[in-house]
Amino acid sequence: MKNKVTVVLMLSLLLLILGCRADSSQKLKQQSVNPHHTANQMGKKPVIVILIDSLMDKPLQEAIQEGRAPAMRFLLHQGQYFPQVVSSFPTMSVTIDSTLLTGTYADQHHVPGLVWYSDQKKRMILYGNGAKEALKIDQLQVFNDAIYQLNQVQLNKKTKTIHEALADKGKESASINAIVFRGRTEHSLKVPRFIANSNRVPEQVKITGPKWFSYATFAQLDPGNSWNTSPWKKFGMNDEFSAKETAFLINQKKLPNLTITYFPGNDNLAHRKGPTQLEGIEKADQALQTVLNAYGSWEEAVQNATWIVLGDSGQSAVYNDRQAATVDIRPLLGHYRIAKLNQPVTNDDQIVIAANERMAYIYAIDNNVDLSDVVKLLQHENKLDIIAMKDGKNNIQVTKGRNGSLFSYHPGGKFTDEYGQSWTLSGETNLVDITLNNNRIKYGKYPDVLARLHGAMNSHEGRYVVITVQPGYELVSESSPTHIGGGAHGSLHEQDSLVPLIISGTNTRPKTLRIVDIKDWIMQLVK
């Protein structure tokens, strides 16, 4: 019974937080001994990034019109607004945040999704995709993947995060409730006692993050913010906690050159109630007001800091009927031996499925399984929107469900897109909804599809097929979570891929309206 209780408690924390506590008492002591100045006092306006999970343009505009988002309305009217910024792919938070922090797609930062299979380790990697899935595998491994492996191992060490790049230039930064946070400062994460009591988990885990680090109940900057770390407030993984931690840095005049603050609440509400809900945006705006109020007035806030408010991904509405909305590809692949989630992968297994809501990786772990045969079987499902694989020459081949056409491409060539990327293309371009005019590529309903899909197809080792489903549908596999009648993301479609961006306090903007280009722009802002 004790082991079961430990598992339940651990999962409740893991799935809500994906992190552990830093030694905040020591940190605060060090900060009081070594007082810092804000970036503005050092002659440069600090940059504050507010990342609102699943923030979308249309519901944001509606919330503003109804008077439910006055803070975002103020920043928008004081600055610039871009309703369609392209996210990363898969449109899952860990991959998107890795793109935001590194300025690269998944082929360079190596975080393929929330769920994926490591051919090297011969096991599934889950960062907390849902209780049903996590309960079927080694829970302590899930815990370790989320709190340590994601940032310290799986995020490519050869690709600098913005925290690392700023530290290398003598600049300071802060991460507040962000999932991806790797930096140059070592922190000792204190594992909760009920987990540390297990002989498999150490009491402390060493990680690296930015100078100023806050992560829900386990890494608290503001000693007075404990009320927001209670179990009924998701142990600190909430907008109010994030806002008060950021306001604390402002009030203490310790705001560094860059602060990245994550507001998670809107995502959960959009998943449950659908992408048109406004409640999550209203709550996020209230949290933003807390941060702005720390300056005394909102006008002073804009004068003294550069503000960047953006979403990470959109969401597509999922149909209300479970049978109609869910796409289970296991029956299509039924004559293969599909690995079970609750068992180690064996030499007898042939296929592994890693579902990320509206996309999935299908791995052929048996060398006798031909990927092209897997694709042919998948084509029998007409709800599949994109089916992609690499051929023997590293070309990416794309088809669809119930469609015999083929599109193939690879980087480099005579065709150039709006982002200055060049490609070699052949076959049916309508499969990825691009049009060509004088060797110029124009994207349609799949923004920056060539680079984003290329990123996922080269994000990690192994032989695999990438699939996505059409809007309204969600992929399911063994025990994966569903969002019937709510919202889901993960795909390349514009509904999942386009997010709004508010900029206030500077007249500049990223060189392109893509999350992948925000890092370089921020680096210029804090030079």
Residue ranges and their predicted role:
Residues 1-8:
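Bacterial N-terminal signal peptides that target proteins for export
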Residues 61-115, 174:
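Short, structured active-site-proximal loop/turn typified by the sulfatase FGly-forming signature C/S-X-P-X-R
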Residues 236-250, 257-259, 266-307, 317, ...:
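A long, amphipathic alpha-helix that forms part
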Residues 24-25, 104-105, 111-271, 427, ...:
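His/Asp/Glu-rich, glycine-adjacent segments
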Residues 16-19:
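C-terminal motif of bacterial Sec signal peptides marking the signal peptidase cleavage site
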Residues 302-303, 311-364:
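Acidic/histidine-rich catalytic neighborhood
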Residues 23-80, 91:
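Active-site-proximal N-terminal segment of extracellular/periplasmic enzymes that hydrolyze or transfer
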Residues 158-159, 348-509, 515, 519:
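Active-site neighborhoods of enzymes that stabilize oxyanions during catalysis
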